[in-house]
């Protein structure tokens, strides 16, 4: 029996030939990628159940529908799904719902997108027991639809400048929610435009004229039966965006709108009837929603990248173009080294990012549990790490997806490829939930403190212990040597930025300005620190794989990932004579050697992502490889192929008939 389980009669012959070359069992690698055999089995069970329900599918590709039509499509599917999901899935299980939503809704959003990602987790992590009893089950069952309203028109990343107020009225035991200026209008929350009945609102808590800072409030904005907007609320859609247009991002403002005292989420902070304020055990316990969101973002980015790699590598095996030697047969474009250099590093990043996502997910869950018991010891480390991962992963994933799009030539530019959609969904994450440069600078503040400890010889946290670790000069362990190079680069960048900053301080420049004057160096240090974390995690995960054939494939991908990232930072390797140009050239050759080894298994590796055609939504990435005939069919579905089009009848025909 073939090792690749996707081989079927009648498929494109080039793709079939590629699959017969597999040196490993695709099911075994799929289990590694998806977190175990049980998880993989469950994914396939859910997919089979969805397949039985025709009313969850679309008649036309989304690209051939208007935005209003697409909003109607996803809302119809959501209603149908919520009515039937209990028959085959656990709607309280995050994995079940994630798998089903990816399959049914796609990645461009739907009315419950932010509801699932932020609204429900905030209730779970910041509401007290009584509040959880009031609201959680309704939220899980879709009886109320919510979003998370924090960002304002005038301020996003700078939370301290958020203007919305929630002033406590002791006489009525209510909070008065108010939007004092235009720039205080909540802006961007997904689902706010037309879908949400409620929001978790982040506003300044004010008691007796004293501002206690930002706190979350459970706020109804529309009647859930009539969907009429509540008096004192102004809400609407902000219009089309670069991507993710099945999410109705919106605006929200309040005119002295009143809510009950108990609508402030009170698991960590409390306000009594008399207006007495009880502070949380740690000032940043409210970060749990943000930490959860970032951990999920990293996972989604890895998955978007996996989809792009499946599309581009399958298509590169089907597409024949040009000749390596004139007069010979046209070759598969996957055989060109330039094509491999474009997309194989992205393939390696899929596994590196997927591992990082699993790690930070577990760390986030542990942190939230500890916070619930009043222990905030790991919060600072996790916050810093999540900032770095969010910035590096979103940037590199979107970068690799765009390379995959370009590698597919003109057809990659077509919506039929789904690559433009993957890119716009991925690149949006570079700015939402914290603009990437700001995220790197937040991590830099953490690294600045670590560097100060390193200079003083103090004990270091495990994440930054490399700052006082000597370089490994001799080792036969290839991974150990390459990780030592990552440590050297991160250490060099962090300590360089720190020492430059200290030199300015000695000249009388204040710390904040000295830091700002070297912020570019600090962002480079933050990137290197984050890449070290990802590299370590990837190597560790590969070493834990027991299946020998899968281990060999992942070892090659890890070598490709490490060598590619090192060459991206090669100037740091030769600085101060750490490595010679010859040493760096050896690392560069490792990239080419790893690409050559990966070539044979490339199609089978992306098959192991186990993404079905319905979910992939790509003509170029079809499992059967029948690209060209289906591109033609896809084009026939365009509404512009209808007769008597208004723009022709009203303007073009009268114009040409007179000439």
From Swiss-Prot:
Its cofactor is FAD. GO terms for biological process: ascaroside biosynthetic process; fatty acid beta-oxidation using acyl-CoA oxidase; pheromone biosynthetic process. Activated by ATP. ATP binding leads to a conformational change that promotes FAD cofactor binding and enzyme activity. ATP binding likely occurs during acox-1.5 folding and/or dimer formation. A motif (Microbody targeting signal) lies at residues 657-659. The active site is at residue 433. ATP binds at residues 395, 403, 524-527. Gene3D superfamilies: Acyl-CoA dehydrogenase/oxidase, N-terminal domain (1.10.540.10), Butyryl-CoA Dehydrogenase, subunit A, domain 2 (2.40.110.10), Butyryl-CoA Dehydrogenase, subunit A, domain 3 (1.20.140.10). InterPro entries: ACO, ACOX_C_alpha1, Acyl-CoA_ox_N, Acyl-CoA_Oxase/DH_mid-dom_sf, Acyl-CoA_oxidase, Acyl-CoA_oxidase_C, AcylCo_DH-like_C, AcylCoA_DH/ox_N_sf. It comes from the Eukaryota. Substrate binds at residues 284-287, 294, 432-433. Keywords: ATP-binding, FAD, Fatty acid metabolism, Flavoprotein, Lipid metabolism, Nucleotide-binding, Oxidoreductase, Peroxisome. The keyword Protein biosynthesis does not apply. It holds the Pfam family Acyl-CoA_ox_N. One of its GO terms (cellular component) is peroxisome. Transmembrane segments: none annotated. FAD binds at residues 148-151, 156-157, 190, 319, 339-342, 410, 435. Pathway: Lipid metabolism; peroxisomal fatty acid beta-oxidation. GO terms for molecular function: acyl-CoA oxidase activity; ATP binding; FAD binding; fatty acid binding; flavin adenine dinucleotide binding. It is an enzyme of class 1 (oxidoreductase). Its EC number is 1.3.3.-. It is found in: Peroxisome. Homodimer. Belongs to the acyl-CoA oxidase family. Involved in the first step of peroxisomal beta-oxidation by catalyzing the desaturation of fatty acid-derived side chains. This is Probable acyl-coenzyme A oxidase acox-1.5. It comes from Caenorhabditis elegans.
